């Protein structure tokens, strides 16, 4: 059973939730062999109805104490561009698609996704581009994220937010 896990973190990202459960996106996931989609929707107002039909299951929840189990079971992670969610997924060695919130484009999240993509660790897109990216991406091209280098990440974030030149 191939599983895709979607996380929006502690905030809301209704556009992402709606995009992922749209019929065309679900059909693309099915065509790629995914038959289980798990959504962590945070405090969003879009609340898809969970269902299970042969051969596809959709599970939905707002929060859990830890996402560790969902990340471990995931064959693909689709995440908002929050630094914590990105790093946790990458450190677990999971293929990652980061969806940048177009309403927050003037923040560090876009820069982080862009840099980690440039280094070959993830794919990124906006909500409207997600179906096309899912169809065209080659997960085998992703490079493993080197674990245990928080100082490198911290320095990058400092530079992005203007604390360091």
Swiss-Prot record:
Superkingdom in the source lineage: Eukaryota
Chief localisation class: endoplasmic reticulum
Disulfide bond keyword on record: no
Q: Which GO terms describe its cellular component?
A: cytoplasm; cytoplasmic side of endoplasmic reticulum membrane; UDP-N-acetylglucosamine transferase complex
Q: How does it sit in the membrane?
A: Peripheral membrane protein
Q: What class of enzyme is it?
A: transferase
Keywords per UniProt: Endoplasmic reticulum, Glycosyltransferase, Membrane, Transferase
The GO molecular function terms of this record are:
N-acetylglucosaminyldiphosphodolichol N-acetylglucosaminyltransferase activity
Record's signal peptide: none
BP terms from Gene Ontology = dolichol-linked oligosaccharide biosynthetic process; negative regulation of TORC1 signaling; protein N-linked glycosylation; regulation of synaptic plasticity
User: Which locations, inside or outside the cell, does it occupy?
Assistant: Endoplasmic reticulum membrane
- Name the chemical reaction catalysed here: an N-acetyl-alpha-D-glucosaminyl-diphospho-di-trans,poly-cis-dolichol + UDP-N-acetyl-alpha-D-glucosamine = an N,N'-diacetylchitobiosyl-diphospho-di-trans,poly-cis-dolichol + UDP + H(+)
Q: Which SUPFAM superfamilies does this entry report, sorted A to Z?
A: UDP-Glycosyltransferase/glycogen phosphorylase
Q: What is its EC number?
A: 2.4.1.141
Keyword Repressor in the entry? The reply is no
Q: Which InterPro entries match?
A: Alg13-like, Glyco_trans_28_C
Which pathway features in its UniProt record? Protein modification; protein glycosylation
| Complex and partners | Forms with ALG14 the active heterodimeric UDP-N-acetylglucosamine transferase complex.
> What role is this protein assigned?
Catalytic subunit of the UDP-N-acetylglucosamine transferase complex that operates in the biosynthetic pathway of dolichol-linked oligosaccharides, the glycan precursors employed in protein asparagine (N)-glycosylation. The assembly of dolichol-linked oligosaccharides begins on the cytosolic side of the endoplasmic reticulum membrane and finishes in its lumen. The sequential addition of sugars to dolichol pyrophosphate produces dolichol-linked oligosaccharides containing fourteen sugars, including two GlcNAcs, nine mannoses and three glucoses.
Which family is annotated? Belongs to the glycosyltransferase 28 family.
The protein, known as: UDP-N-acetylglucosamine transferase subunit ALG13
**Organism of derivation:** Rattus norvegicus
Q: Which gene encodes it?
A: Alg13
